Amino acid sequence: MKMNYIILFLFGVSLCACFDDKGNYDYRDMADITIENIPEVIEVLGNSDHIVVSPKVVSSLDGEVKEGDANFEFTYKIEKKSGGTMVAGQKWVDLNPSKTLNLDTLAAFAADTYIGWFGVTDKRSGVQTSTTFDIKVSSPTYEGWMVLCNEGEQERVRMDMISAISAERVIPAYDVLAPLGFPELRHARGIGFYPNRRANPDDVIYVMSEEGTYRLDRETFKTDESWNINNVDFIIPPGDEHVVYYNTVNNNNSSEALACLCVTDAGNAYAQVLSTPGAAFEKPINTSARGEAPTYRVAPYIGVSMARPGNGKAAVFYDMDNQRFMGWKQGYVDFLMQVLNPIRDKEGALFTFKTGMDLVYMESTRYSNGLVYAILQDAGGKRCIYGINMSGNGYLPESMYKDLNAPDFDKASIFAFHSQFPYMFYAVGNKVYLHNLGTNTTYPMNSIALGEHEVVTMLKFNLYRQCSLKDLNNQSDEFMARQYELMVGSYNTDAPDNNGGKLGFYPVDGVNNSVTKRAEYDGFARIKDVVYRERR
């Protein structure tokens, strides 16, 4: 009983103490904070644009919180969306050391997608409210059209870009390789591009010229002599020859191709069979037995099915010395994939693969599920067109066009074949023509209006090259349609500097045999090749 009295006494003392201490606490209500006016995604050009955020912060007790309110502190941080560290082993970077409400800071980050974090702290209660948003940082070389040019009379190799920063923002950038270690080379020939989902090599980008071919870092475009294709992809570097044409053979594998193939300016062909451990280019394959010396020269073209996902396992070359088509095919025996073989004629076929003519041009398309077009010329200067279907086992003679009603076709050296319609485009001087192969009718493309001092330097359709087009980061109908637009590269020979090049994009009307200009960019050198740098 005595213990109960003691407990009751202590409880009373404590209760009195609480009443006495009543004025020592702040019973202010907690404020609810809402954050508005922050976009879901901010897209910027790295080391050029600023990351700008102007949020609206509202307190349920104080109303809208303004810049300089001493009761609140603001924090902005950034981290990689894919994870990993930013700098000095830290996961986050503080974008706003001054703790101000509004953010305006240079986007000094590598091209990638990041998560931005904005936090509001009520310093009176210590309660913090936050929200996140994406920050997509692009570089001039991150995504867009790689425009390979020859600059000036010396034809210095120069890479320009049409950078796709966003759907609404497309910006030309010029001579992007000059500060990135690219050597001084002359006579550009083309761009080799092999996107794939393998960790090694990942996306492959080659700039090809008559003085050397160099691989570019897939993110930064940096390069040096160690990235010379002879040092990267060849077991034994070839002698005095340079890779000038590069292509891949794709089947239905969504991760990688079956093989990479190339041709040098010496007329030698090489095969890199990707299923082989330590795959690399070996000895020339334009020979009768693996490892032996070449016995003929091949033209600088490689015909494959461009269907995606891939549907073939073969490629077609052209033997310039013996005027015949030669075949490469994926197989189960390594040595058979290191030799080209004559393509056998089938009884009753539309044409023979031993043509007795010179090859003028060859192009790979998606038309008819993988048709390769070849323009051939006989000794009398007359031209015809063969269509070889390369789907499946390939080498199917599918079409042949003779006696073309095509003005100046015999003078043309620049061509492009459409992948949706039976159309051939060709250029002579500053004129572009559309030839309908189905009706043997030619239409001058008057909507492609070039001046008297302008000449066409390139015609092309940029077919996307991902192993699976479903991997592309942009699945919009508009973006997919871009690959069927005619690209027209032209040059003004009267330009006061070396920047007289233009690149126009023309959607093709398959009903009215016509084209219309969608966009045009200028300031380039003499355009040789254009390839879209795709992203997954």
Regions found by a protein language model. Give the residues of each.
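Acidic/polar, low-complexity intrinsically disordered N-terminal segments immediately downstream
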Residues: 19-175, 472, 476-483, 495-536
